[in-house]
Design a protein with these regions (language model features):
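Active-site-proximal helix-loop-helix substrate-binding element of RNase H-like nuclease domains
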Residues: 18-21, 25-170
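Entry/capping segment at the start of metal-dependent catalytic domains
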Residues: 1-18
Length: 176
């Protein structure tokens, strides 16, 4: 997202300031990134991607997995995308598994539970080359430098959910 002021005034979707610049999705065995509003082209047709995503989110029988769903779903709402299925948030599920953790960020959870981490090397190198902050200015980079990172984000979230789901069942926490 392009979300100026998030650290000082909160998420832009509430203030109607900012926009979604790309959509990362993952299913078992595949992940993809659809750039729609990066400052530096090329981007895909925003309306075409939005229509496709709206259709994908219209299935009531599908579980939609997020890490920090409150944020992502808030931005999807600004695109008139309504998720019809069940929303599952790994940021909520992780403390159910271990409420004594100090941090629940995606990278740390992936490292601890999946023994993997997202590679930010390419993203950081590209940001440095462009003179940008790799996270705050991600939207200014061409999608070719962001896509792999965004795809990893979606894929790791899905794998983390598979792990947490087993833990929740194994600890008999399903009804919590």
């Amino acid at each position: 997202t392009r979300d100026p002021g998030i650290k000082t005034t909160g998420p832009g979707y509430i203030r109607k300031h900012g926009e979604v610049v790309g959509i990362a999705v993952a299913v078992d065995g595949w992940e993809g990134y659809y750039p729609i509003a990066h400052e530096t082209p090329p981007n895909m047709d925003k309306e075409l991607v939005t229509r496709w995503l709206r259709k994908q989110c219209s299935y009531e029988s599908v579980n939609y997995i997020f890490h920090n769903a409150f944020y992502d779903v808030g931005w999807l709402t600004t695109m008139d995308i309504d998720i019809k299925g069940k929303i599952i948030d790994t940021l909520i599920a992780a403390p159910i598994v271990d409420e004594n953790r100090f941090r629940f960020d995606l990278n740390l959870l992936a490292k601890d539970y999946l023994k993997e981490s997202k590679s930010e090397t390419q993203l950081r190198e590209a940001a440095k080359m462009w003179g940008l902050d790799p996270k705050a200015d991600l939207w200014k980079l061409p999608a070719s430098h962001v896509g792999e990172y965004a795809e990893q984000d979606a894929a790791v979230t899905l794998r983390l959910w598979h792990h947490l789901k087993k833990e929740i069942a194994g600890q008999n926490l399903i009804n919590i």
